[in-house]
Structures are given as C-alpha cells and as structure tokens.
C-alpha cells in the first residue's frame, strides 16, 4: 500500500498530510463526526453531570462507550474509513439497549443519557453511511 502523493503549488509531488482527509470530505460529513465526538464526550461525562456515579455498571458503560464513540468519530475526521461509521452505529445501538441489558434501567438519568445520546449517535452514523453510499459519481 503506497503513500498518497499530491502535487504541491510548485508542481512537485508532496505527501498527503492528515488534514487532507478533513479538507476532501464534505462539510456535512465532518459536522456529523464532530457532533458524534461531542456526544461521546457528553456520554462519558454524564455520570458526573447527571449524578449516577453510584451506579457502577451505568458509570463504566457511559465512560467506555462514550470514550469509544468520541475516539472513533475523531478518527473519522482525520482518516475517514467506512468501518468507523459502522462502529459508531453499533455503539449507538448498544447505548440504547444497555440500560436493560446491563440492568440499570431503573436509574432515570443513566437511562435517558444512554437512550438520547445512543439514538442521536446511531442516526448520525447511519446518515453518514447513507451519504457515503449515495454520493453522486463525479464525471470530472
């Protein structure tokens, strides 16, 4: 697998830097990943913000899943790969069902945080996948 090279202003080839990925993706796709990164951080901080740190399973799930969502979304900003959106879709679905699967559905703050953030992350990841698969083919 070779390194992508582009011609710089002088006409000489230059190596692709990590920000070329951000510049070449659509603004709305970058916005989706940025929103998902912020939502992941919000989920990771939710136990302290919403006061459910006493519920160990909910706290650890929010921290791990939130951090994973944020890291995957930030990774997609710098080097987009389709699998990153599939991972965030799966993490969003997991966050939706985690309160019942892990057993903290009776903790209102934890349940609502997981449901709302999981739903938004899942929908945005699915939207990003839809955009990738329905992008018009360039003829230029």
Residue ranges and their predicted role:
Residues 1-34, 131-140:
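Intrinsic N-terminal pre-sequences and regulatory tails
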